[in-house]
Amino acid sequence: MKLRVFTEPQQGATYSQLLTVARATEDLGFDAFFRSDHYLHMGDVGGLPGPTDAWITLAGLARETSRIRLGTLVSPATFRLPGPLAISVAQLDEMSDGRVELGLGAGWFAEEHAAYGIPFPGLAERYEIFAEQLTVIDGLWRTPLGQTFDFAGEHYTLTGAPAVPKPVQWPRPPIILGGAAKKRSAALAARYADEYNVGFKPVAETNAVFDRIRAAVARAGREADSMAYSTAQVVCVAKDDAGLARRAAALGRDLDELRTNGLAGTPAEVADKIGQFADTGVDRVYLQLMDPTDLDQLELIAADVSPQL
């Protein structure tokens, strides 16, 4: 089981704080450091000092780490043009010596688009944009060196793209998709995804989504083991009830609710819950660390949860 640290910097974090978390992620033996890709905070938090750009952050971390994998969970397709995004991620793959993964989604947070003047079309059009971006990015990365890439879609047209730089990873960095796996998203996942993520859902619901993805993978003629499955869950781990109550209060969450809808409890309880997800096929868990200053919790997970998995 791979444990990955997942941060939400839009809720309030500086680059320096994220660098500290990434270094701890590497030093403590976790598999990866991921971050969200948002420009606006959510809920009753100030979000200060303000948003940080996901891919600039990861570029910095690529030069400050040597082992952990790096990526977004997930980047909205509405934020960037697919050609420049393919270039950025390929460059970051070189900067990190092949440690980058691209999480991509259709985009959902209308308020952040309005706040920063980013167009936010209806859901059907966002899915069209999302699908075309996957085609373009995958096509640019897979085009043989020395050949050009062309694409004519409803939203993007590329003519004679040189399709460089090439990523270090061959044929391309892993692509992570996620969501409820409705018919269209399941088909896109079966065509493009290396990993499917279901975030913040109970075990049974997670498994039901995975069943739909497995069926789509089979219909696409792919090998069953060519798709990795993952979950993202808010984490709240402590050795005793007092510590759990303190961490839950810091999150502004009810502890009983966290036990139901997250990874909350003692190390043994959290290891057992991760085991339940493992039974659904999950082989990597994104631990949503809402407080980037709480490195003690990461140390506890590394020392007392990881060995039980």
Task: Label every PLM stretch briefly.
Residues 1-309:
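Active-site-adjacent structural elements that line small-molecule/cofactor binding pockets in enzymes
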